[in-house]
């Protein structure tokens, strides 16, 4: 456990932001550099079958230390950080024994405030790792990587802890939805796995959104503005009309829990052509279909108003709710709950308002729920993590390996 914080602090200095416009895998050079460093670290640690493939996937195994059959289990985390905030020159700072109030982030005016982030009220006495206010932290998901490797280090050092075969993997490009694209499930050779990619202590998740991307294209007519009367059709105005037709109360800032949403995530605007990017999310497959149908209806309505087919919409499916693939295997969740309780961690089962590699892997034959890292406020400059949460995640991984082995001894 003594290497955990230092390991994490070292990992976050790697610039591993994924790049959605680059369709190579991995999408950024920094991920290749980080993958190589992890590969070398796992070799040095003494794990077996350590590999780094051409797509940047790092895998390794810890062989069983018991003399009876135990299903192989896996632990997975991702190497990339979100493109939503700067991930270069990350300078983490440790706040020891937090006692409340605003936390100054670096030398500027940026603060981490309990007024804006009430979770801080629950963390008095904890040791926090924050950003310096200029970048994200990268706890999502370098904390998961540090926790998995530290857990393997503990198991290697203490053969008295029984465990079956354990596979670990670190994936590229999860943040841009491609983390499972080249994942070799057969090579990984686990019966089930857990992503270590959740938030606060105790999170255990096996439900996630059904997800799709919608592209709305508005076609206009560009004419010199000096002679544009009755000729110009401004595609940006059409796009604005469409935006206002969408239900405002079903956007991310107005939804929570099991509520789905429409999220306008980007736009490219010009008079001649404007393009809107939406992400659609719903926990029910039929609900996602209904959201797509509503957008198609709004496009038809707007085209009728314009008296011409100037607007079109297309959809791309992203991932599905893993619930249907995990629920038939209740022992996967039960063992995780038992491991948490044994570590004095209260399991908090909740839906993931997003997706993980585990969602797609579950549909590739590898049921894969999600476990906490101890982090908060991912994807932005106010991201932070508690050292206690990281330590708890390590303890849960170790205990989960042990509980699985003991379960199959009976």
UniProtKB/Swiss-Prot annotation:
UniProt GO BP: peptide catabolic process; proteolysis
The protein's enzyme class: hydrolase
Protein residues bound to Zn(2+) 1: 78, 140, 197
Molecular function terms, GO-annotated: metallopeptidase activity; tripeptide aminopeptidase activity; zinc ion binding
Catalysis: reaction(s): Release of the N-terminal residue from a tripeptide
Cofactor binding remark: Binds 2 Zn(2+) ions per subunit.
Residues that, per the record, bind Zn(2+) 2: 140, 175, 379
Gene3D superfamilies, alphabetized: 3.30.70.360, Zn peptidases
InterPro entries hit by this protein: ArgE/DapE_CS, Bact_exopeptidase_dim_dom, Peptidase_M20, Peptidase_M20_dimer, Peptidase_M20B
Entry keyword annotation includes Heme: no
Cofactor: Zn(2+)
Annotated active site: 80, 174 (proton acceptor)
Enzyme nomenclature, EC number: 3.4.11.4
A single GO cellular-component term on record: cytosol
Alphabetic keyword roster: Aminopeptidase, Cytoplasm, Hydrolase, Metal-binding, Metalloprotease, Protease, Zinc
Key word Ribonucleoprotein present: no
Subcellular location: Cytoplasm
HAMAP family for this protein: Aminopeptidase_M20
Function, as annotated: Cleaves the N-terminal amino acid of tripeptides.
Family as reported in the entry's similarity comment: Belongs to the peptidase M20B family.
Designated name of the protein: Peptidase T
Organism: Vibrio cholerae serotype O1 (strain ATCC 39315 / El Tor Inaba N16961)
